[in-house]
Curated annotation (Swiss-Prot):
It comes from the Eukaryota. Pfam families: Chalcone_2. SUPFAM superfamilies: Chalcone isomerase. Expressed in developing cotyledons, young seedlings, roots, seeds, embryos, macrospores, preanthesis and tapetum. Restricted to developing and reproductive tissues. It is found in: Plastid, Chloroplast stroma. It comes from Arabidopsis thaliana. Gene3D superfamilies: 1.10.890.20, 3.50.70.10. The gene is FAP1. The keyword Plastid applies. GO terms for cellular component: chloroplast; chloroplast envelope; chloroplast stroma; cytosol; plastid. Dodecanoate binds at R103, Y116, S183. One of its GO terms (molecular function) is intramolecular lyase activity. This is Fatty-acid-binding protein 1. Belongs to the chalcone isomerase family. The lineage of its organism: Eukaryota, Viridiplantae, Streptophyta, Embryophyta, Tracheophyta. Keywords: Chloroplast, Plastid.
Length: 279
């Protein structure tokens, strides 16, 4: 028999949460897959009263759990509620999912289309060190609302990944390249002034016309140690650019003051702040 605790909270407005073990899950589905020798379990949270969160079958064992539970996070997934697209709760050795969101785009000013769902991952050891070193004396509620905390997360040499999962089936790589040309270009000007055309080109040129991005395909934007931005399409590395400014500009799109999805940003900050108190 196995026991499991998912440690982070994710939101969907309006927020309706079910709390357990010091954390809450709000309007997302968390699925767990175990091997042939173990039983499978699925856990879902919903505002629909006919589908309440399932009882924890192994609640009597929760007190003995480590902070991450006894099932590896690689076996878990979190669903972005508006699209139904799922994201693994962990990627790599120590990057954990701290927020999920949706990128929308206005089409001819008439309607919004869902372009891609995204998940924001961060190396938990790196985040815990940052929080512990600088914010150890503050409660989590104050850390979350501290603007310098957000700035520190984007400025620090923390390994992070933004995983994009394509929702709009008619999207092509040229559209992605043009969209980043605009959005990342604006952030480069915001943080570094106007003379960054060469840096922007070094990033957008990684999105070559030969790459296909059908619905459900993934694009990973990873900030590696040393402020190196690495890009992977469908798990295949396509190039890297070493630039602190570029990394900051990319992260600002998703967790900055004017993000693509405010709920995703709030979830990310909440969960990042909670890491300091997850012993």
């Amino acid at each position: 028999m196995v026991s499991f605790r998912f440690p982070f909270s994710f939101s969907q407005p309006p927020r309706a949460t079910t709390s357990f073990s010091g954390f809450s899950i709000s309007a997302v589905a968390v699925s767990v897959t175990v091997g042939a020798a173990a039983a499978g379990a699925a856990i879902a949270a919903s505002r629909n009263p006919s589908h309440p969160i399932l009882e924890w079958a192994f609640s009597s064992h929760r007190s003995s759990l480590s902070p991450w539970g006894s099932i590896t996070l690689a076996d878990e997934s979190v669903v972005e509620p508006k699209t139904g697209f799922s994201f693994p709760a962990s990627i790599g050795d120590s990057r954990r999912l701290l927020g999920v969101g949706l990128r929308k785009k206005s089409l001819l000013g008439l309607k919004n289309i869902d372009v891609y769902a995204f998940g924001v991952y961060a190396d938990c050891d790196d985040v815990k060190k940052l929080v512990g070193d600088k914010y150890a004396n503050l409660p989590a509620s104050e850390i979350r609302g501290n603007k310098s905390f957000m700035d520190d997360l984007m400025e620090a040499d923390i390994k992070m990944t933004i995983r994009l999962q394509i929702v709009y089936g008619k999207l092509n790589i040229r559209s992605v390249r043009n969209a980043f040309q605009e959005s990342v270009g604006n952030r480069l000007k915001k943080f570094g002034g106007s003379d960054n055309d060469e840096l922007l080109q070094s990033f957008t040129s990684l999105f070559k016309d030969e790459y296909k991005i059908p619905r459900n395909s993934t694009i990973d934007l990873t900030k590696d140690p040393g402020h190196v931005l690495s890009v992977a399409i469908e798990g295949n590395h396509v190039g890297s650019v070493k630039s602190h400014l570029l990394c900051r500009s990319i992260l600002d799109l998703y967790i900055g003051e004017e993000p693509f999805d405010k709920n995703a940003r709030e979830d990310f900050l909440d969960n990042a702040a909670s890491l300091a108190f997850d012993n």
